[in-house]
Amino acid sequence: MALAMKVISQVEAQRKILEEAVSTALELASGKSDGAEVAVSKTTGISVSTRYGEVENVEFNSDGALGITVYHQNRKGSASSTDLSPQAIARTVQAALDIARYTSPDPCAGVADKELLAFDAPDLDLFHPAEVSPDEAIELAARAEQAALQADKRITNTEGGSFNSHYGVKVFGNSHGMLQGYCSTRHSLSSCVIAEENGDMERDYAYTIGRAMSDLQTPEWVGADCARRTLSRLSPRKLSTMKAPVIFANEVATGLFGHLVGAIAGGSVYRKSTFLLDSLGKQILPDWLTIEEHPHLLKGLASTPFDSEGVRTERRDIIKDGILTQWLLTSYSARKLGLKSTGHAGGIHNWRIAGQGLSFEQMLKEMGTGLVVTELMGQGVSAITGDYSRGAAGFWVENGEIQYPVSEITIAGNLKDMWRNIVTVGNDIETRSNIQCGSVLLPEMKIAGQ
């Protein structure tokens, strides 16, 4: 308890220092620009790694930075500094002002609209400092690694266990009078091992992450899951080239919807560089599927009271009954499109994709015969056409049951068709991502094998 109270007092002191830094920068810029915005952050924590129970690395870090953007006569200049002394802040502000003199005027440039700002940011319960000493952190990492190593004699090597615990302070202010900040924590534990059988070697990992230590799985759970995942990959086979149904396991299904983020981002829309350019208000997913955004989810890993421009975040339906309801807009992209910012400067905030109640095992039965994808490789996705082609590994399924692991295959399709034809989304929700969804069943994809 004493350690946690010490961290809390340190963070409160840091926050006051950061607020003073932001106020100083804004004051220096106020008479020399039409508008300004300042963001400053400080992250402190410990990272520990072990291998065969021995300490590999113990790293303490305390990193901070201030960034300022000024706007003058529709010209924009930005500068940053890791030194928060008054003299350094003054130099940084002047550097931003100097840069603005040489940039081209842009009528869409400027501070976020005042009526959209989060002048009263809510507390989202993101701050849970850990009472973990370096010795305890080392023990947690070693236990996770050891649990994996002891699970099976086929596990012959290890890449180690790791534990991370960090707390951070973010403060944002602008020339509209906004000055808000919040504190947050993030803790994680992981392990990675190598298994060997008949000359074949495979590796995999497992991890747990949360805002509070109490949200983490035990080291023994991490090790056991790591061992299970690694052993399941042994003796993979290759597939013949074919077309077949595909299940994206939950941890890769999040990426399937991650491509939607880029496709509906305001920057892609005003540049006309997205295959969903004419899709606003149209159906792009099955009519039973809705994507909700919950930026104020308590303790959420992607929760935030405001975006990186100070715009307040709000609960939204991104997709409603399969229909795309809005673009993801920053202040700049919104002005380019004649719209208002949606609070998405810096990314998305806790997307939730509701499943249809089927377990993963029930989805296997529904698919019958086909491919389960558990790993994806490469970046073969076109933002212009939606064409999708990526290296994959996973498991072959027959009669609703997993038969054997597969590797060295490529799956291909087009995202428009893939999204529109989703058969079902499972109830095995992956909660460790900014996109929370279960496994996804597609009726057919091209599979390129041997």
From Swiss-Prot:
Top-rank taxon, per record: Bacteria
GO biological process: protein processing
Organism: Escherichia coli (strain K12)
Protein keywords: Cytoplasm, Hydrolase, Metalloprotease, Protease
EC number: 3.4.-.-
Function: Metalloprotease involved in CcdA degradation. Suppresses the inhibitory activity of the carbon storage regulator (CsrA).
Protein localization: Cytoplasm
Note: In strains containing the pMccB17 plasmid, required for the maturation and secretion of the antibiotic bacteriocin microcin B17 (MccB17).
Xref: Pfam families: PmbA_TldD_1st (PF01523), PmbA_TldD_2nd (PF19290), PmbA_TldD_3rd (PF19289)
Native organism taxonomy: Bacteria, Pseudomonadati, Pseudomonadota, Gammaproteobacteria, Enterobacterales
InterPro entries listed in its UniProt record: Metalloprtase-TldD/E_C, Metalloprtase-TldD/E_cen_dom, Metalloprtase-TldD/E_N, PmbA, TldD/PmbA_N, TldD/PmbA_sf
Cellular component GO terms, alphabetical: cytoplasm; cytosol; peptidase complex
Alphabetical list of Gene3D superfamilies matching this protein: PmbA/TldD superfamily (3.30.2290.10)
Family: Belongs to the peptidase U62 family.
Name this polypeptide is given: Metalloprotease PmbA
GO MF entries: metallopeptidase activity
